[in-house]
């Protein structure tokens, strides 16, 4: 039965007030929302739905708050499947779901791919759902077993927190802002406590450790973060939004529309060259292709004098007859901080007395992208802009470089001292070459002291599965069942890995108890009754 207009109005304003009170919670003390409670409530339906993932989001927020406060870290790795998640939660307090792993092993089309985010947008949410359902099941199974035993025996029984919060990879959002909102909705419905989204362009997205990354303007990525928060607010959840920036190694950007990006855009300083794209089009029309086109581009690039505007001005000052060149450079750098290119040009004109040639359109690629010079300071610039809209911030990096991680953390915290940071302990890094083992052992702790309160190995699930599969298959081919005993079953028993009794692990006892409950206490078809082979392991 429909509400009357008066009832509808009263319910609306009650919800608006409830949302305003919710936003006053300390959880949101650093969060900026460019929309109102009235707008959020108007986008909700009449039926209030309580999402279980909200419990997980609250749990995750409490965890990272405590870790940041104590300068420690929660650390985890990318989980492949339900078996893995049940082993991870014994020792780790969060679970990560990687887009890379999902792309290679779990696309909803079953078509493997490298990490280009070209799989259907429900791929990673589906993996989250698989792990979340497993967490819920094993939690039920464990609770039933414990409550089936008297209190005095429970201390000796497993009491694992299976419900470790899941943080998942949202790539670039798989499209425009409505796609970001739909993806966020999927993640909340499927059990994610938090998601991360990166500032790459969706059609050209690459793994964080591949070349050819194209960024979107700062404002566009902020819109994505706002879209995530708006969708979570509509659904009434505390979902954590993690902003990832790939700007440390980026070389291209889609647009120069945001002045905050201007300082890192690269232009040509050679007025005698025609624009690169015009040259390439003419060469193609002349029948050139492949290596010939590449040679033309390489030659143009070598002659173009590509550099950022501030570097071009500094070079001009150094070449000028100014009495105190360093003072002029210092004044220029001080005055252009935070300014657009138009404003920076005016400042340069005042110092040099003339305009300099610098053209950011001339080097544009055939796709229309602008050249861009990334780096740690570039990433700091973006992180500072993202901070009011993100719960954590992550800079993707090429190496496990502590000095760089420190530079980034200090740069962000100089503006936003309470900003929580995340760090990818990537398997793309050669850890043996990067640092000695004693430093490897302390790396997570040292990063935690800098504010990196959540850290993760994206693909450890993939690599550990590949390693044991290779070791076992090789030994099995040579030794037969001896390999299974020595490499798998005996170590399982020695380490008390619960999967050694896989029927019990899978919930056979739990299901037997369900059957007994509905059949009055007796079942002649109990899975774990007389004859079950797991009696051999008692």
UniProtKB/Swiss-Prot annotation:
Pathway: Carbohydrate metabolism; glyoxylate cycle; (S)-malate from isocitrate: step 1/2. It is found in: Glyoxysome. Its EC number is 4.1.3.1, 4.1.3.30. It catalyses: D-threo-isocitrate = glyoxylate + succinate; (2S,3R)-3-hydroxybutane-1,2,3-tricarboxylate = pyruvate + succinate. Its main location: other. Catalyzes the formation of succinate and glyoxylate from isocitrate, a key step of the glyoxylate cycle, which operates as an anaplerotic route for replenishing the tricarboxylic acid cycle. Required for growth on ethanol or acetate, but dispensable when fermentable carbon sources are available. Also acts on 2-methylisocitrate. Its cofactor is Mg(2+). The keyword RNA-binding does not apply. GO terms for biological process: glyoxylate cycle; tricarboxylic acid cycle. The gene is ICL1. It comes from Coccidioides immitis (strain RS) (Valley fever fungus). GO terms for molecular function: isocitrate lyase activity; metal ion binding; methylisocitrate lyase activity. The lineage of its organism: Eukaryota, Fungi, Dikarya, Ascomycota, Pezizomycotina. Mg(2+) binds at residue 169. This is Isocitrate lyase. Belongs to the isocitrate lyase/PEP mutase superfamily. Isocitrate lyase family.
């Amino acid at each position: 039965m429909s509400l009357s207009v008066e009832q509808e109005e009263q319910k609306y304003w009650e919800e608006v007030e409830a949302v305003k009170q919710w936003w006053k919670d300390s959880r949101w003390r650093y969060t900026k929302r460019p929309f109102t409670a009235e707008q959020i409530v108007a986008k909700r339906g009449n039926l209030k739905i309580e999402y279980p993932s909200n419990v997980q989001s609250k749990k995750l927020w409490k965890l990272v708050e405590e870790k940041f406060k104590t300068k420690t870290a929660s650390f985890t790795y990318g989980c492949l499947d339900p078996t893995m998640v049940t082993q991870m939660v014994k020792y780790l307090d969060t679970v990560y779901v990687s887009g890379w792993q999902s792309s290679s092993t779990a696309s909803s089309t079953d078509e493997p791919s490298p990490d280009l985010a070209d799989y259907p947008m429900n791929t990673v949410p589906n993996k989250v759902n698989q792990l979340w359902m497993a967490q819920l099941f094993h939690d039920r199974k464990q609770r039933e077993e414990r409550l089936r035993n008297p209190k005095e025996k429970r201390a000796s029984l497993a009491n694992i927190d299976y419900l470790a919060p899941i943080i998942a990879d949202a790539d670039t959002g798989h499209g425009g802002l409505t796609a970001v909102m739909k993806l966020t909705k999927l993640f909340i419905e499927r059990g994610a406590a938090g998601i991360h989204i990166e500032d790459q362009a969706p059609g050209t997205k690459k793994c964080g450790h591949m070349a050819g990354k194209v960024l979107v303007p700062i404002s566009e990525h902020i819109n994505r973060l706002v879209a995530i928060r708006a969708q979570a607010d509509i659904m009434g959840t505390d979902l954590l939004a993690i902003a990832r920036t790939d700007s440390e190694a980026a070389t291209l950007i889609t647009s120069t529309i945001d002045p905050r990006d201007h300082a890192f855009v690269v232009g040509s300083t050679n007025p005698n060259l025609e624009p690169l794209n015009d040259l390439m089009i003419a060469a193609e029309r002349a029948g050139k292709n492949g290596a010939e086109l590449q040679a033309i581009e390489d030659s143009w690039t070598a002659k173009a004098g590509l550099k950022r505007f501030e570097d071009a001005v500094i070079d001009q000052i150094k070449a000028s007859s100014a009495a105190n060149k360093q003072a002029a450079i210092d004044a220029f750098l001080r005055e252009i901080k935070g300014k657009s290119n138009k404003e920076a040009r005016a400042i340069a004109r005042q110092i040099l007395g003339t305009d300099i040639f610098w053209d950011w359109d001339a080097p544009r690629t055939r796709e229309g992208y602008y050249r861009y010079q990334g780096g740690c300071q570039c990433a700091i610039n973006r992180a500072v802009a993202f901070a009011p809209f993100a719960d954590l911030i992550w800079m993707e990096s090429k190496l496990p470089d502590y000095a760089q991680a420190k530079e980034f953390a200090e740069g962000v915290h100089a503006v936003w001292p309470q900003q929580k940071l995340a760090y990818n302990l990537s398997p793309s890094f050669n850890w043996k070459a990067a640092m000695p083992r004693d430093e490897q052992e302390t790396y997570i702790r040292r990063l935690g002291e800098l504010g990196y309160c959540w850290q993760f190995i994206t693909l450890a699930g993939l690599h550990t599965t590949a390693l044991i599969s290779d070791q076992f298959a090789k030994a099995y081919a040579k030794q037969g069942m001896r390999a299974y005993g020595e490499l798998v079953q005996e170590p399982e028993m020695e380490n008390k890995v619960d999967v050694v009794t896989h029927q019990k692990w899978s919930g056979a006892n739990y299901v037997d108890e369900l059957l007994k409950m509905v059949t009055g206490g007796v079942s002649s078809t109990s899975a774990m009754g007389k004859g079950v082979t797991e009696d051999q392991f008692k």
